[in-house]
Amino acid sequence: MPTINQLVRQGREVETTKSKSPAMQNSPQRRGVCTRVYTTTPKKPNSALRKVAKVRLTNGFEVISYIGGEGHNLQEHSVVLVRGGRVKDLPGVRYHIVRGSLDLQGVKDRKQARSKYGAKKPKAK
């Protein structure tokens, strides 16, 4: 433990926090082009085929992003909007693709949590 005198001379070093989504470079979202769209399996104990895409962002970064929701229309060369946010059971996936924006359509027939999946309000009968 330092003495008061040592603290007066030196001071405490502030710990800098490392970004959890460095490819965003302090932007809320980034545009990118899909270079590969594929499925991958999660870590134990989960089991599924999770839909992910490798995206080249406008700032040159190449990231793996998760495609949320049921069904999607993404292909290679699709232009997408990428936001931060990791997927806990997929190692290396630290970004999400925004549904209902640019080339990615919203989830069809979605009734709840629509804003998260880019779904329009259903017509009232």
Curated annotation (Swiss-Prot):
GO terms for biological process: translation. It comes from the Bacteria. Residues 19-29 have a biased composition (Polar residues). One of its GO terms (cellular component) is small ribosomal subunit. Disulfide bonds: none annotated. PROSITE patterns: RIBOSOMAL_S12. Keywords: Methylation, Ribonucleoprotein, Ribosomal protein, RNA-binding, rRNA-binding, tRNA-binding. SUPFAM superfamilies: Nucleic acid-binding proteins. It holds the Pfam family Ribosom_S12_S23. GO terms for molecular function: rRNA binding; structural constituent of ribosome; tRNA binding. The modification 3-methylthioaspartic acid is found at D89. InterPro entries: NA-bd_OB-fold (IPR012340), Ribosomal_uS12 (IPR006032), Ribosomal_uS12_bac (IPR005679). Gene3D superfamilies: Nucleic acid-binding proteins. Residues 1-31 are annotated as: Disordered. The keyword RNA-binding applies. NCBIfam families: rpsL_bact. Part of the 30S ribosomal subunit. Contacts proteins S8 and S17. May interact with IF1 in the 30S initiation complex. With S4 and S5 plays an important role in translational accuracy. Interacts with and stabilizes bases of the 16S rRNA that are involved in tRNA selection in the A site and with the mRNA backbone. Located at the interface of the 30S and 50S subunits, it traverses the body of the 30S subunit contacting proteins on the other side and probably holding the rRNA structure together. The combined cluster of proteins S8, S12 and S17 appears to hold together the shoulder and platform of the 30S subunit. Belongs to the universal ribosomal protein uS12 family. This is Small ribosomal subunit protein uS12. It comes from Paracidovorax citrulli (strain AAC00-1). The gene is rpsL.
